[in-house]
């Protein structure tokens, strides 16, 4: 029996892989309407179900794009993703709150970084407002600041709800999913690729492959001979502030340091009304290392951002591991990597924050890249 050959295989069922599958399901719907053959697709993951890692273990923030370095894929895809994520939530009835983000300095040297943030906002076409005492008191009464930047397009949703909604739609449309399946080898042949799964127990044949394996994307890339990227596992932990839902209305962020630390430890009013503080940035020695920080750092950061937090209010929440492309101490701000090698094998590497927000735009970008090849099917 000739083995089934798929038009497309997606490695990784985190938010980016799922979003590509969902967008493909929409393309297939249109193809059916005009009596064209559907694009066959399989999504493969080593875990037992979807979004087991960073995709469900993040702040759930719908970012505006103000933090991203201008003229990068990250900036472009985050700004576009912001608009698309709200549209998606509306289309699939996913709850969200578009409450804006207040970014405030917490030391004198932050003033220079405030002007850098303004510059980025203008360059990335993100609407913002410089706010002072009275306006801050209206937006976030407990914020400790006399000046800040307010970005109205930022919001919050539940990242797992988004992942599950797009997964359900993709599944409904006939896209196949294969869990508990780790890709351990890749053979290229004239019609595409053979993916070897779980110690040779299974194989999957596909014409085009997308590597969206998150933390393990560099290892999948190495199987194709693309060796120039290394993913550094960077833990982000969150504490929950109990019993004081009034402290934060939406999102309160520090002014970022524009380096390996990311956007900084921030306060998020989650959809259930609880407040999270995090994430920190702890570089791990391996991708499966278990680590837990002390509460001190979180209490200290919360106290710098708002009045009225006491140490007793904090309880440990959850953690996730980012797929970072720079090591600890780096001053670089790496861009998302979307690279094709060899032909028809596309790698998505270092898709960390704002990867969740950017995911619908990343999916569109990829499918545009493949549009001509998929139309031929």
Language model features with spans:
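Beta1/beta-strand and adjacent pyrophosphate-binding region of the FAD-binding site
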Residues: 2-16
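Helical element adjacent to the flavin cofactor pocket in flavoenzyme catalytic cores
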Residues: 149-207, 360, 369
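Helix-loop-beta segment of a Rossmann-like dinucleotide-binding subdomain
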Residues: 3-5, 68, 95-105, 130-133, ...
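Active-site substrate-recognition segment that forms the wall
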Residues: 94-96, 212-343
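Short beta-strand to alpha-helix junction loop
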Residues: 70-80, 104-113, 149-168, 290-293, ...
């Amino acid at each position: 029996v000739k083995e089934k050959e798929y038009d497309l295989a997606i490695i990784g069922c985190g938010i980016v892989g799922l979003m590509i599958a969902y967008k493909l399901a929409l393309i297939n719907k249109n193809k059916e309407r005009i009596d064209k053959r559907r694009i066959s697709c399989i999504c493969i993951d080593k875990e037992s179900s979807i979004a087991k890692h960073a995709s469900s273990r993040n702040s759930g923030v719908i970012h505006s794009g103000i933090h991203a370095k201008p003229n990068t894929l990250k900036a472009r895809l985050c700004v576009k993703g912001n608009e698309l994520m709200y549209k998606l939530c509306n289309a699939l009835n996913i709850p969200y709150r578009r409450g804006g983000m207040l970014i405030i300095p917490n030391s004198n040297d932050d003033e220079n970084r405030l002007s850098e943030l303004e510059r980025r906002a203008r360059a990335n076409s993100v609407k913002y407002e410089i706010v002072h005492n009275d306006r801050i008191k209206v937006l976030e009464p407990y914020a400790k600041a006399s000046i800040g930047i307010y970005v109205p397009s930022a919001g919050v949703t539940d990242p797992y709800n988004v992942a599950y909604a797009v997964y359900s739609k993709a599944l409904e449309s006939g896209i196949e999913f294969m869990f508990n399946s780790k890709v351990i080898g890749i053979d290229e042949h004239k019609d595409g690729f053979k993916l070897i799964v779980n110690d040779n127990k299974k194989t999957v044949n596909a014409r085009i492959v997308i590597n969206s394996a998150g933390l393990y994307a560099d290892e999948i890339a190495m199987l194709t001979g693309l060796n120039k990227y290394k993913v550094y596992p960077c833990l982000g932990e969150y504490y929950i502030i109990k019993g004081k839902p009034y402290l934060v209305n939406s999102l309160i962020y520090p002014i970022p340091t524009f380096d390996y630390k990311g956007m900084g430890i921030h306060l998020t009013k989650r959809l259930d009304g609880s407040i999270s503080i995090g994430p920190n940035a702890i570089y791990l020695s391996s991708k499966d290392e278990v680590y837990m920080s002390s509460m001190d750092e979180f209490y200290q950061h919360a106290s710098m951002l708002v009045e009225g937090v006491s140490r007793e209010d904090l309880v440990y929440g959850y953690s996730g591991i980012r797929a970072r492309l720079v090591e600890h101490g780096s001053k670089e701000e790496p861009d998302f990597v979307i690279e094709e090698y060899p032909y028809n094998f596309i790698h998505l590497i270092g898709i960390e924050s704002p990867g969740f927000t950017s995911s619908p735009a990343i999916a569109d970008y990829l499918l545009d890249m493949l549009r001509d090849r998929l139309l031929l099917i």
